[in-house]
């Protein structure tokens, strides 16, 4: 074993990454097997995933094979998978490198055995009957003398020849044949598309719209007639605006289309007899040319359809391109959902614990807090009102003080005399004989010298008013 881990020049053992090995195995499996048919029992089926995809296993008594059906394929299946049902699966083998598993990507699924088909048929019949698709009151009356009859059947079988022959003998009229496969995996879908196509034809168009539709097929086993038990066929007949006659199999053969059709004929010949009331000759040449044209068109379309399918098989499908991302997304989605559930449970337990810790004291505290907030708001409003009131009173006092200020008197032209001791001189007797006197004006001060000029200092002396003395009194 050490030889594989020793990096010497002599070793020839190649080194691969895990992704390279997984990719190589994936290519080998897909290129070696391609499409396979696998018979097995469905195990582990739990319905469709949230994304619409289906995951389960196919098993027998010795082995198990993982299987997946993408949503687009699941919607086209004729029957829903069930736990324990034995089926035949058709698909491609591939691997899922994320978990080193190999699986089959199923593209077609069918049950094995008549018993399984009968069980599936009864379940489908009950489901459609519960929806009211088989009610007799909802069936449409057949026209007495249709101008054009549309026939949905195989263009090369004996059924169409019997219908054409019988209608031609009774009443020659215009017959429209919509060629379909009456047996196989695609027969049900083709019949449903044909019914919808007849109803979609416009009146007065290049292709005339029929007044009556006949869906016909010869007899066969339950598996051969299974396409006419398709739910899409039943719903197409129910939704058809044109009356429909079913003529599938022999008189003892019953399919779901017989329950929903407006009239059931025991045989295709009986359908032709019910569709037209009289018997006339049909021009053989026109019938022969019509049959040759239909067969030629059928061969032409079959050839080009097979060629186109060969080209399509070489292209990767959307499901193949998105197989791995879809699988990874589904796994991540499942983990995310589980994680969300766990997180919610933890939070719920946490909040439950907090709820148990709550007490009436906390509620009283909350009530006191609300009261405190209310008192604070009221105190704030009272404080604001008091401040506004004091501001108004202060403004009144300020205006009164300003009106009594001596500065206002000085502005009117008066002078304030101050003695040497800087005291106000109010009377003449206070005037000093010598020294400096300060005179204060409105816009400044000045000093003057006091001299005695023999002024009469008597307080009772009269002041002689000169002609130039027009100054008013100070007080």
UniProtKB/Swiss-Prot annotation:
It is an enzyme of class 3 (hydrolase). It catalyses: Exonucleolytic cleavage in either 5'- to 3'- or 3'- to 5'-direction to yield nucleoside 5'-phosphates. It comes from Bartonella quintana (strain Toulouse). It is found in: Cytoplasm. This is Exodeoxyribonuclease 7 large subunit. Keywords: Cytoplasm, Exonuclease, Hydrolase, Nuclease. Residues 466-475 have a biased composition (Basic and acidic residues). GO terms for cellular component: cytoplasm; exodeoxyribonuclease VII complex.
